[in-house]
Amino acid sequence: MKKILLFIFFTFGILVASEYRALEDKSIVYKDKNGNGKIDYIALFKATDELYIYARAYPLKFKDEEQKKAAFSDLLKVEKIFEFMDSEGFSKSLGGQEGEYFKICQARLHVIKHNFDVQGEAKKADKIYGELINLTPDNGEIYAEFADFLANSNRIDLAEQNYDKALNLGVKRANLGLALVKLARMDQKGALPHLEEYLKSYADDEFAKILANSIKEGTLKVEP
C-alpha cells in the first residue's frame, strides 16, 4: 500500500471549501413595528456558528480570499453586537442554556480571531473557556471544545488534559482528539486504541478509518 503522508492540523474530519454566506445585518439587528431597535439573539448565535464552521481551526476553510475578507468583516460586526449586549446588560437577562451559549459564542469569536492571526485572542478565549468550565464543570463538551482549540494552537499537553476530562464525562469524540495528540508525539501505538474507541461511536468517519487502518498496516507516516 502506498505510504500515506499525514499533516496534522487538528481538524476533525475534512471540510471541503464551500460557499460562505455573507452576514445579513438586518436578520440580527432590526426595528419592530413601533420603531424600536431589536436584536435577534438566536440569529446572532447562528451567525457565530456559521463563522465558527469555517474558522474554528487553522488553516481556514474559506473558498477564496474574497470570502475570507467578507467573513472577517462579518466577524467584526458580530463581535460589536456581542459587546453592545454585554455593555447594556442584555446578556445577563439570558438565563440557562441561552446564557451559557452566549458565553460559548464569545469564546468562539476569540478562537476565530486567533485563527485570523489577531494577536492576544488566544488568552481571551482561554479566559472565557475557563469561566465556562467553572460554571458547568460537568459539561464534557466544553472541555472537548477547549481541547480542540488548545490542540490547534499547539498546546498539546493542555489539550490532552482537557480531552481526558471530556472523555471521563462521556464525550466519545474526545477519543479522536487524544489519538491526534498521540500522533503529534509520534506515538502511533498509543493512538490506535483511541481511534478504535472513537470508531465504535462514529463508524462512518472515513478520516478516522484511514488513520486506524494505516496504523495497523504500518503505512502511516506522520509529519507534524
Please report, for each region that a protein language model flagged, where it lies by residue.
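Terminal, low-structured helical/coil segments at or just beyond the last alpha-helical repeat
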Residues: 35-42, 190-224
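Short coil/turn linking the two alpha-helices of tandem helical-hairpin repeats
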Residues: 55-66, 107, 111-119, 153-154, ...
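Amphipathic alpha-helical repeat scaffolds of TPR domains
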Residues: 37-65, 94-114, 141
